[in-house]
Regions:
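Catalytic-site microenvironment of enzymes
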Residues: 1-156, 161-201
Length: 201
């Protein structure tokens, strides 16, 4: 068709769509303070300045006991390993290979924390490998088991790879720092609000 629409499965190597580098502006977040931008989707009122001055509620001991747990509800979320501006049918968005999925990213984060004196447990269980449905229930069980085994853990990080775009275009969220591109990072934090209960704020 003249529209260029893909009407049949593409061969590996045939472009299905484009990849666009984009800085997702934090100025649409609604609230900001310094370099912190907040999109508040709850009915709660948040004062970022006040929150930054409030006690955290725990203190890192920098001991040999694990204080951070890194895990992945969707461990098979994967990355492309090369820079290009298109994607094909051969470019998987999920992989059980720890060389290209979130377990690889989690280990890199763990290495940085360990290098700074913070003991880390990195649980590489692939909760979504067999089925996407139920992965949060399975990862919750993993977190509970680790907290029971390592009561010294103070912080749990569930690292994901975001997915922004459409079937025809994938957005690569980046910000240039100096002369290098860096991936943008978003923290998702829940709280008790509306139908969400038993969730400490």
């Amino acid at each position: 068709p003249s529209s260029g629409a893909v009407t049949a499965a593409a061969d590996p190597g045939e472009a299905l769509g484009k990849i666009t580098s984009k800085f997702i502006s934090p100025y649409t977040a609604g609230q900001s303070f310094g370099n912190i931008y907040l999109k508040n989707s709850t009915s709660k009122t948040v004062d970022i300045s006040e929150e930054l001055q409030s006690p955290v509620g725990f203190r890192m001991e920098f001991s040999s006991e694990p204080e951070v747990l890194i895990m992945h509800t969707h461990a098979t979320e994967s990355y492309m390993l090369e820079e290009r501006d298109y994607f094909t049918a051969a470019d998987a968005t999920r992989s059980t290979s720890d060389a290209v999925n979130m377990n690889h990213i989690g280990e890199k984060v763990a290495e940085v924390l360990r290098a700074n004196g913070i003991a880390v447990v990195h649980d590489m269980t692939q909760h979504d490998a067999e089925a996407y449905t139920g992965s949060y229930d399975r990862s919750a069980a993993t977190v509970s088991a680790n907290l029971k085994k390592y009561p010294s853990i103070k912080v749990v990080l569930d690292l994901h790879r975001d997915s922004v775009g459409t079937e025809a275009e994938k957005i690569k969220a980046v910000q240039k720092i100096g002369d290098k591109n860096a991936a943008q990072i978003m923290l998702v934090m829940g709280c008790e609000d509306g139908s969400i209960q038993n969730h400490p704020n």
